[in-house]
Amino acid sequence: MLEEFGNVIAPGGAGVVIASQSGHGLGALTAEEDASLAMTPADELLGLPMVQPDQVRDSMYAYQLSKRANALRVMAEAVRWGKRGARVNTISPGIIFTPMAKDEMTGSGGESYRRMIELCPAGRGGTPDEVGTVGALLMGPDGGFITGSDFLMDGGLTAAYRFGELAP
């Protein structure tokens, strides 16, 4: 679908795709894997060796890989959109207090979510309005120089997983 929008986007247009903080939780991929996820036509993605059942460890890995692919595909697509005078970016939110997140907080994984929030630098989850504010920046004239970028807005959760108390 992203490619189709790229075919019709008007000069001066902008787009935002929601990815996820989870894509940042995936370990490093090779340059070849990044390029494959970014550039393979959408209808051929399931043929990539890296997404074959024997390569996908579990459902979390599959989810993280799909979110990483979202951000990489937008980055690659930004090159094409730029030729039309348009921009496209991703936002990768962490725990945002939507109705779904509130359900997850009270479900079986609730303790894990509460621990992540407690140990992330911001000490709280985000709000839909905060995501909307970043989206408005990216879509509006103040974001005119921003394209092909992924905005990680997770209250520092990824930092805590890499360098803080949530690090392995």
Indicate residue ranges for each PLM-predicted region.
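Conserved catalytic-core motifs of eukaryotic protein kinase domains, centered on the activation segment
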Residues: A28-L29, A101-T106, R162-G164
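Hydrophobic structural elements of the Rossmann-like NAD(P)H-binding subdomain
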Residues: V16-I18, V88-I91, A101, G148, ...
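C-terminal helical subdomain
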Residues: F5, Q55, A62-Y63, R68-A71, ...
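Glycine-rich, phosphate-binding/catalytic loops in enzymes
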Residues: E32-S36, G107-G109, A167-P168
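SDR active-site lid
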Residues: A86, I95-D103, G107-A122
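Short C-terminal tail/terminal secondary-structure segment
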Residues: T147-P168
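Catalytic loop of short-chain dehydrogenase/reductase
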Residues: N7, P11-R84, I95-T98
